[in-house]
């Protein structure tokens, strides 16, 4: 007696699962392009190199207080924060979890936060003592 024709409760559940699996299975086409939109390995490498490049940048910025160093440090921090927040949003604010509308709002808010942070830090660099001098003042307390 075959498992599918059996009328026990386990066999019925198994048949129902097979029917559900047949209805919900999706075939994903495989892209043959060398760099597809879904390939994030290059982006991941750039993020890692960027983070590694910030290791000598931060101590150097402590000793060099120029507007150019302020600008470089500002861009480095803003990009690092942007990629971090974008990663969190892409992991936890998926449309499947929170809905399409909230997922779009979350993705848009990442860019809004990034623009506000960049504008604020550039304004601070131009109208006040600058980022590197401010860090030195904080550490001298």
UniProtKB/Swiss-Prot annotation:
GO terms for molecular function: heme binding; metal ion binding; ubiquinone binding. It is found in: Mitochondrion inner membrane. Component of the mitochondrial electron transport chain complex II composed of four subunits: a flavoprotein (Fp), an iron-sulfur protein (Ip), and a large cytochrome b (CybL) subunit and a small cytochrome b (CybS) subunit. There are 2 developmental stage-specific forms of complex II which have the Ip and CybL subunits in common. Complex II from the free-living larvae (aerobic environment) acts as a succinate dehydrogenase and is composed of the common subunit Ip and CybL and the stage specific subunits FpL and CybSL. Its cofactor is heme b. Pathway: Carbohydrate metabolism; tricarboxylic acid cycle; fumarate from succinate (eukaryal route): step 1/1. The lineage of its organism: Eukaryota, Metazoa, Ecdysozoa, Nematoda, Chromadorea. The gene is SDHD2. The heme b is bound between the two transmembrane subunits CybS and CybL. One of its GO terms (biological process) is mitochondrial electron transport, succinate to ubiquinone. Belongs to the CybS family. Residues 1-24 form a transit peptide. Keywords: Electron transport, Heme, Iron, Membrane, Metal-binding, Mitochondrion, Mitochondrion inner membrane, Transit peptide, Transmembrane, Transmembrane helix, Transport, Tricarboxylic acid cycle, Ubiquinone. Heme b binds at residue 80. Its main location: mitochondrion. Residues 64-68, 127-141 are mitochondrial intermembrane. Residues 25-44, 90-104 are mitochondrial matrix. This is Succinate dehydrogenase [ubiquinone] cytochrome b small subunit 2. It is a multi-pass membrane protein. One of its GO terms (cellular component) is membrane protein complex. Membrane-bound small subunit (CybS) of the mitochondrial electron transport chain complex II, which together with the membrane-bound large subunit (CybL), anchor the catalytic subunits to the inner mitochondria membrane. During the free-living egg-larvae stages, which occur in an aerobic environment, complex II acts as a succinate dehydrogenase by transferring electrons from succinate to ubiquinone.
